[in-house]
Amino acid sequence: MSDNSFGKLFRVTTWGESHGPAIGCVIDGCPPRLKLSEEDIQPWLDRRRPGQSRFTTQRREPDQVRILSGVFEGQTTGTPISLMIENTDQRSKDYGDIATRYRPGHADIAYDMKYGIRDYRGGGRSSARETAMRVAAGAVARVLLRTLVGEGVKIRAALTGIGGQTIDPSRWDWDEVERNPLWCPDAESVGPWEALLDSIRKDGSSIGATVEVVAEGLPAGLGAPVYGKLDADLAGAMMGINGVKGVEIGDGFAVAALRGEQNADPIAPGPQFASNHAGGILGGISTGQPIVARFAIKPTSSILTPVPSITRDGESVEVMTKGRHDPCIGIRAVPVAEAMMACVLADHLLRDHAQCGWGR
Amino acid sequence: MSDNSFGKLFRVTTWGESHGPAIGCVIDGCPPRLKLSEEDIQPWLDRRRPGQSRFTTQRREPDQVRILSGVFEGQTTGTPISLMIENTDQRSKDYGDIATRYRPGHADIAYDMKYGIRDYRGGGRSSARETAMRVAAGAVARVLLRTLVGEGVKIRAALTGIGGQTIDPSRWDWDEVERNPLWCPDAESVGPWEALLDSIRKDGSSIGATVEVVAEGLPAGLGAPVYGKLDADLAGAMMGINGVKGVEIGDGFAVAALRGEQNADPIAPGPQFASNHAGGILGGISTGQPIVARFAIKPTSSILTPVPSITRDGESVEVMTKGRHDPCIGIRAVPVAEAMMACVLADHLLRDHAQCGWGR
Amino acid sequence: MSDNSFGKLFRVTTWGESHGPAIGCVIDGCPPRLKLSEEDIQPWLDRRRPGQSRFTTQRREPDQVRILSGVFEGQTTGTPISLMIENTDQRSKDYGDIATRYRPGHADIAYDMKYGIRDYRGGGRSSARETAMRVAAGAVARVLLRTLVGEGVKIRAALTGIGGQTIDPSRWDWDEVERNPLWCPDAESVGPWEALLDSIRKDGSSIGATVEVVAEGLPAGLGAPVYGKLDADLAGAMMGINGVKGVEIGDGFAVAALRGEQNADPIAPGPQFASNHAGGILGGISTGQPIVARFAIKPTSSILTPVPSITRDGESVEVMTKGRHDPCIGIRAVPVAEAMMACVLADHLLRDHAQCGWGR
Amino acid sequence: MSDNSFGKLFRVTTWGESHGPAIGCVIDGCPPRLKLSEEDIQPWLDRRRPGQSRFTTQRREPDQVRILSGVFEGQTTGTPISLMIENTDQRSKDYGDIATRYRPGHADIAYDMKYGIRDYRGGGRSSARETAMRVAAGAVARVLLRTLVGEGVKIRAALTGIGGQTIDPSRWDWDEVERNPLWCPDAESVGPWEALLDSIRKDGSSIGATVEVVAEGLPAGLGAPVYGKLDADLAGAMMGINGVKGVEIGDGFAVAALRGEQNADPIAPGPQFASNHAGGILGGISTGQPIVARFAIKPTSSILTPVPSITRDGESVEVMTKGRHDPCIGIRAVPVAEAMMACVLADHLLRDHAQCGWGR
């Protein structure tokens, strides 16, 4: 089954476990003659790489990506692009006692229920490490979008809340996002959040967060009714990021409190929209406005506080997780969210070309 | 492209416009030898049917479903099941002036941007009418789940909020849901909500809402990492319901404020879980707990209040929508949400059979 | 599962049994703004319709197609196109004794082995009647190809052999194909073949045949390595026609006897090819030459000669089939082959647009 | 697009070019808890490996496969299995003059027409080298079939004809296949064929061939009507092998000459079939009889005889191919055919489990 693939025409299949020899992905359907080299991908991986601040896991790996196929003399050939990162820092001894007991809130029990076996080393396939390949694929999607749509395409994400604290949207500054290790767009939130994270880390606990991702410069017409909706695909993509429990497009849950005249974005010739409650998508199709998605991500289950659980044999036990863990996985979800947005948009761009491109 | 299909193994393809001769769907992959007749489907359609209370559109149609293939002597044969409902009440004259102008907040402009053509009669393909076929497909999914899993499977939804007012969860009563025309589980909310809806309707306006859907009695092991996640598929399915702008699983957005020890559901032998913050899904795989999804749905864009807009020719105009419309599309989204949940679960059950069923 | 669909981007899903109320198909992915009406489809159905000569089944039905969705004011809208034909002549009494015994060479035993149930009326889903919807879908594919590629597209098939007799290729005349009831391109073969068929019919027997289908006027670049090969898709499409047991592209099985210098088609500037051993496809991709496929179709299993068989209960029995049957199903496979070729090409055209269309 | 994948539930995606750093594949959907190690795969690769006799290309590589994911402690985990073989012998200088001119009969011109770029080193993606990964995937499919169906599953292929000479079927001996370097089942054909191949090789030419592949011990019920037919999938899989131009199931093209009573396989209680004209498949579904497929493969286009062609710039030129090439690619197609058969059957086995497994 294609459970490890996403996208229909820009199709990404990822493979690999946290502590196996390598992780990788295959991108099938990328158009030919795009300029692509490892230099287009590596910077995005570097952004996501752990060990860069005290707020992400201390696992240290170069995460050096290699292009193994699909590129010739600096250009894509239209054949599958295989990307691989070798795992170099695999301190699997840290995870020894995890082999026989389940972490509450973690996927390990669900894997065992389904498969009757799991690679427990570092979370195996459920590790956030898998998201490195999403970031790599997203980098290729960015090249595709830049080449086919134009330099004006911008896909950016930011951390907008943590532990119940949220930014002041009026202070949103995209440049600030690049300046602090939390990808926070509100300079005044950075200090308090760093203090909160330090305290969480000291407690051996973890904390939830919210992330917003915005795509600008995309054409109208991406997406399709009724089950090929751009917002439905984005919702699936964002909900598929490890730990995400809620997803919004545009005004999101706030629409529940609105009346029709408050929610409808007035249209002026252009077309120009006087507001963007819709988050750039109507009827599942992009309108040319910024595409806005938002999600909440739970606190990681790997904490030092003991929680009641059971062993594989079904006996009661208390579980706490030693080892290196992010106190807030929302931080590293920021580059992943951008990458997933880029992949979904690249996919829908090709889908639109296929069906509707002929008469333009 | 398969934009009008959902599901991989229990695959539903819908077709039809609001004011065409009929709407229908084809279900491919349904197992053979399930007892199925129109009587298994019709009651669910009757629940969703418009015109039953003053809070839903006054379009009156019997919505009589016909099984055109795939069933022989009262049993499914394993071949595609074709379902059809004829459109009998198509007062298309109501929509005449909509042909040349766009309703702010409506899909019509997006369809035109993408396709350069749209069937403007009653919203065409973007009409909520299409969801009748989801309900029909959901009824078949229920038969599948009941037969393969057991009578204990329950998939139920309820209206949990409207216009910013929410139910008191402590008063949740599933029986109440069947007793009031709003599918509200809190008897004390019904009166005030009916009053609110009357006022909204009198104003020619509309209002947003929230819906919760719960599936019980399902086995552990449905879903898959990493892009076949049950929660990701549910998120896509719910976000694909007309007007939905936000989706949650389990605690949803509330997780952003939680610490790891608050979020993790403790596990006791069984396994039993002491709480259900996860909404029945860990790592994209069901755990056997109730599966809980929630979504927010925007106020419909068809309102009597004039909103600035443009014509197809790009000229400024004010638009207001005459005709028959639901003041709160969240109400009729309740049976649709149940149906989508049923379809997603049926699909994942078959997917699990395929990959993991062999050794059980 | 999508077992009743074919095509990826021009996606056709068929449904319906021989003796159910109707048969139909849904075409998903058709581009918008193609001029389409029932008049574009009906003539192709009329060509295939049974009862037109003494060499095809005497079942008489108008096979009147209805477009139920996806077309508005004479143009496709980009939404799914639903086509339906009502079954009007369903003399199911003819098939009564078939319910409990298996016809040697027929699909009925295989269906029962797989599904544990089958709709035995007229072959149910395995009936050649299903191919009417392929012809209908093929007619839409022709409109697509004509609109997107040009009027020069020609997709034609002919009966090239019957019962071991073959045409003389030097007498091939496409006009002759339309003049005789066998779709035979060689005027001198028609008489002897009619005599053979009369004798076969008198004997209550049936006979095998070969069909060749040729597509001209298509661009180079359709298809893809390695599992999206145009020839592999054509082979699957042709082998999927009821009764087909062998498929060839270009020189087909004759290549087994050739040396490299005999098989290679020399290339001149243009590019022009000095011959077409390849059948218009190299490496799975079209070259702009005529695309040539050929297949062999077995004699139908419905014959008056008794053959040893068993009942559903596993008891020995002799089976002979009364009722109306084609003495040579190869004849009616001719329009079906054209339709499948058209659908495969339409699909690959859209696939090529998606991936490679951007820079052209 | 998923052009580089095959299978729906046992899904194989291959990547890599002849002269890139490596080739590989990802298998998604393999059931968990199958015993699998590199030792299960390597022997099949060794069978296919070039350089083992004077009749296959002299490229010498160990073709050492590595499992990079999806296996833990000797068992599959249900997550994607990534396999990789490093390319170690990449004498790309041999192919230098191929960069600017097209080989008649080769895929290079078609790739250029489609993509506007091609990796000309050793045929790039169109190289037979890609088939190594099919053999590797086939080895995993064999493990799946052996585990889920039983030790009785046998999937074997043999070279049945070369240059117009064919074996005597009455001398068919599966043991002989393993004894000669041509995989020929007829001991008396081996000598003359070796002489023919020596002469072909001396001439710098190449020759066509036929291959037959037989699967035994499989259950009835694999496949599905109407577009999920087992024979249609096999036809697509076989036609997708490099150079294949014709495919047959069972009696294949011979059916064109048969009458109904000659073609129908009589059925006795069991069910037992008195003959196997059908090749083990009726109505697209397996019957439990041996599944028999056959194909013709063209002579490779890489020959020393000059053939008229053009350069990339469209100028006339004569092309002959230096370098290491198989005089008869049919020989190395034998293990590839077995592998494709195994993959298709594994896929259909899982598909059957999904839909029909519930009541057994």
Curated annotation (Swiss-Prot), chains A, B, C, D:
It comes from the Bacteria. Its cofactor is FMNH2. SUPFAM superfamilies: Chorismate synthase, AroC. Pathway: Metabolic intermediate biosynthesis; chorismate biosynthesis; chorismate from D-erythrose 4-phosphate and phosphoenolpyruvate: step 7/7. GO terms for molecular function: chorismate synthase activity; FMN binding. One of its GO terms (cellular component) is cytosol. It catalyses: 5-O-(1-carboxyvinyl)-3-phosphoshikimate = chorismate + phosphate. One of its GO terms (biological process) is amino acid biosynthetic process. Gene3D superfamilies: Chorismate synthase AroC. Keywords: Amino-acid biosynthesis, Aromatic amino acid biosynthesis, FAD, Flavoprotein, FMN, Lyase, NADP. Signal peptide: none annotated. It is an enzyme of class 4 (lyase). FMN binds at residues 125-127, 242-243, 283, 298-302, 324. NADP(+) binds at residues 48, 54. Belongs to the chorismate synthase family. PANTHER family: CHORISMATE SYNTHASE. Homotetramer. NCBIfam families: aroC, PRK05382.1. This is Chorismate synthase. It comes from Gluconobacter oxydans (strain 621H) (Gluconobacter suboxydans). The gene is aroC.
